Amino acid sequence: MKFYIDDLPILFPYPRIYPEQYQYMCDLKHSLDAGGIALLEMPSGTGKTISLLSLIVSYQQHYPEHRKLIYCSRTMSEIDKALAELKRLMAYRTSQLGYEEPFLGLGLTSRKNLCLHPSVRREKNGNVVDARCRSLTAGFVREQRLAGMDVPTCEFHDNLEDLEPHSLISNGVWTLDDITEYGEKTTRCPYFTVRRMLPFCNVIIYSYHYLLDPKIAERVSRELSKDCIVVFDEAHNIDNVCIESLSIDLTESSLRKASKSILSLEQKVNEVKQSDSKKLQDEYQKLVRGLQDANAANDEDQFMANPVLPEDVLKEAVPGNIRRAEHFIAFLKRFVEYLKTRMKVLHVIAETPTSFLQHVKDITFIDKKPLRFCAERLTSLVRALQISLVEDFHSLQQVVAFATLVATYERGFILILEPFETENATVPNPILRFSCLDASIAIKPVFERFRSVIITSGTLSPLDMYPKMLQFNTVMQESYGMSLARNCFLPMVVTRGSDQVAISSKFEARNDPSVVRNYGNILVEFSKITPDGLVAFFPSYLYLESIVSSWQSMGILDEVWKYKLILVETPDPHETTLALETYRAACSNGRGAVLLSVARGKVSEGVDFDHHYGRAVIMFGIPYQYTESRVLKARLEFLRDTYQIREADFLTFDAMRHAAQCLGRVLRGKDDHGIMVLADKRYGRSDKRTKLPKWIQQYITEGATNLSTDMSLALAKKFLRTMAQPFTASDQEGISWWSLDDLLIHQKKALKSAAIEQSKHEDEMDIDVVET
């Protein structure tokens, strides 16, 4: 389908378009014209990704000054899906235009997913893979090999060295599988192929961390130009990603490992002093001249990037007391020993970075300035010593990153020292949490650097919370409804059981036997009437375990077994993957299954249950965060004092965005259908419901907001009977989707109404002039 938005020709790779897709593309185009930040909430399953890509690729080709799209998503599966959509779009553009445009689209993920080296790819831990990769690909390793030394290298990486960076791969859209196959065929490293081709790409699709986490962004995204268009897709959790990228946890175990790493560094320094003291002398001279000079090496060799934001890195020489290698090692020893003594606590301590630094100075005489240079100084030392096996240095990296962060940032951070790592632990296992409280710190450089930033998801409501939390002004802020020829999803609020007892996951009520029994009855009854797959979500793993145990003793699970298999999500990703595969198999072969999951878990965030895989979703309770968490309490206090966001408002906003995310799992298109059950009396209150996305709110009828279990079952049965009636594509024509003719008619009407509005406005202006 080809149509115009203003003067921009759009090629859309489907013969039909949803009305909300067209509106979304219009708003996208206007926000790109204006520059700045747009916040757009698009309903689940309405083709958000292809709308974005069609509009922005057309915009790129029409306005060549906007040459690059940086598309950030959260999970591997979403990156793969976006690349597949882009590939389809470019194939369609080629067929319509009659020639192939010079276009390169690439996706980037971690070494763990792209590595081809036989021994490295076997490793399960991402940090170990990164370290092993560096030990084979660092510049000095290659130099040693060329000098005739017998050192292991990676042939996949070595084969890239003789090629020009811009000619590693040909134009086209390369999915992650494509680039891996190409690497196997040509014996070239897929990871470094993509890394080196990023400056030459038209579209880059990768994870948020490549742009928001300074430790990664400084290596990967530093060379991207300011005229890039940045899209954060599935961005409902973007504030949490920002906070995690600047937060660090240290435990006693990590400090012990850091001490071992310091000892091995010391040993290496002594060896180098004996064999080649000029190395250390050269490094010292470079540090005297200035740190940037010392680190002027290939980014691919870098041991670690600076954990602070680029504008917060000090552009000056390293302080004299940590320039010499032996002095720096003594400095690290002293700091780690100090942290170990701080760990010996029996009660919780919370303090600001300023008071922590003052305490460090009082006890150890360590100043703030050298701490601030720790990360860069360690990187320089590891490079000078030419240490290739760095996998044991991960804990030391964390310690120096902590030192650099705590000495750099005074506002928006807190240190919390807890004697127990988990709430229900009995054996002391102290943990030092350095937590970022202000999400705007990490994203601010992105807003300042790039001309256009689009933040979009299916669950951003209430929209006004994000500009407050992330400190930005929008040029466009919109939540779209959903146009349906028939209501293909049924959202309803169940506030009480069949015995009229109110149901809630509130802490005081959650273990009440009548509430547990009523929740169990809801699961049993919906298992009976729902065909194929049913997904249930709970506020936490703790509550899930507790209620499943109670249901087992009440015989409720035995009752559910009669109708469907029962599978449970666990914190272990491998177990959860296995449970999902079994769930899908049971749905496909007609046995049917119930998947018991957790809001904020893997299932709620990245797994789609389209068609028969999810005919109903039940949200048991409201997924509030654990409010006794000290980090959360500190963040709530910060939001209240700094941005005037009340605690209750933030907690409700956070809970409702996760509830909406869970509900959206079962609706993956307008030809799909599903039941959405909100099982908690608190959902009956309008202050909760109004925080749901517009596309869910518009289909919650007044009669479905205060139901008992029996009433909800009657509504669900009626809905499923309706969905079973024949419903063809022609029934949706002109309502839930438009052909090209429908679209042109709509555009004419819009132009006509705009002209009428304009003439009215001019008439009013004339009247004002006459009166004056």
Curated annotation (Swiss-Prot):
| Required co-factors | [4Fe-4S] cluster
Q: Which GO terms describe its cellular component?
A: cytosol; nucleotide-excision repair factor 3 complex; nucleus; transcription factor TFIIH core complex; transcription factor TFIIH holo complex
Q: What happens when the gene is disrupted?
A: Essential, it cannot be deleted.
Q: Name the principal localization, coarsely classed.
A: nucleus
| Binding annotation for [4Fe-4S] cluster | 115, 133, 154, 189
Q: Where in the cell is it found?
A: Nucleus
Check the record and name the SUPFAM superfamilies matching this protein: P-loop containing nucleoside triphosphate hydrolases (SSF52540)
Molecular functions per Gene Ontology: 4 iron, 4 sulfur cluster binding; 5'-3' DNA helicase activity; ATP binding; ATP hydrolysis activity; damaged DNA binding; DNA helicase activity; metal ion binding; RNA polymerase II general transcription initiation factor activity
Q: Which UniProt keywords apply?
A: 4Fe-4S, ATP-binding, DNA damage, DNA repair, DNA-binding, Helicase, Hydrolase, Iron, Iron-sulfur, Isomerase, Metal-binding, Nucleotide-binding, Nucleus
Kindly report, in one word, the top-level EC class recorded for this enzyme.
isomerase
The UniProt note on the cofactor reads as follows: Binds 1 [4Fe-4S] cluster.
Locus of motif DEAH box: 233-236
Q: What is its EC number?
A: 5.6.2.3
Question: Where does this protein hold ATP?
Answer: 42-49
CDD domains (alphabetical) = SF2_C_XPD
GO terms, biological process: nucleotide-excision repair; positive regulation of mitotic recombination; transcription by RNA polymerase II; transcription initiation at RNA polymerase II promoter
Reaction it catalyzes:
Couples ATP hydrolysis with the unwinding of duplex DNA at the replication fork by translocating in the 5'-3' direction. This creates two antiparallel DNA single strands (ssDNA). The leading ssDNA polymer is the template for DNA polymerase III holoenzyme which synthesizes a continuous strand; ATP + H2O = ADP + phosphate + H(+)
Subunit structure, as described in the record: Component of the 7-subunit TFIIH core complex composed of XPB/ptr8, XPD/rad15, ssl1, tfb1, tfb2, tfb4 and tfb5, which is active in NER. The core complex associates with the 3-subunit CTD-kinase module TFIIK composed of mcs2/cyclin H, mcs6/cdk7 and pmh1/tfb3 to form the 10-subunit holoenzyme (holo-TFIIH) active in transcription.
What family is this protein classified in?
Belongs to the helicase family. RAD3/XPD subfamily.
Name of the protein this chain belongs to:
General transcription and DNA repair factor IIH helicase subunit XPD
Tell me the organism. Schizosaccharomyces pombe (strain 972 / ATCC 24843)
